[in-house]
Amino acid sequence: GLVSGLLNSVTGLLGNLAGGGL
């Protein structure tokens, strides 16, 4: 998710796509 992306820049890109933005 977007929040995960802010907290984890490393997994942020994958987390954002997998999290659906949130």
UniProtKB/Swiss-Prot annotation:
It is found in: Secreted; Target cell membrane. Its main location: secreted. Expressed by the skin glands. Keywords: Amphibian defense peptide, Membrane, Pharmaceutical, Secreted, Target cell membrane, Target membrane. GO terms for cellular component: extracellular region; membrane; other organism cell membrane. One of its GO terms (biological process) is defense response. The keyword Oxidoreductase does not apply. Plasticins have huge conformational plasticity. They can display random coil, alpha-helical, beta-sheet or beta-harpin structures. Exhibits a propensity to self-association and forms helical oligomers in membrane-mimetic environments. Belongs to the frog skin active peptide (FSAP) family. Plasticin subfamily. Has no antimicrobial activity against Gram-negative bacterium E.coli ATCC 25922, Gram-positive bacterium S.epidermidis ATCC 12228 and against fungus C.albicans ATCC 24433 at concentrations up to 100 uM. Has an anti-inflammatory effect, since it inhibits the production of the pro-inflammatory cytokines TNF-alpha and IL-1 beta. Has high activity of stimulation of insulin release, which may protect the species from being eaten by predators by causing fatal hypoglycemia. Is not cytotoxic to cancer line cells. Does not show hemolysis on mouse erythrocytes. This is Plasticin-TR.
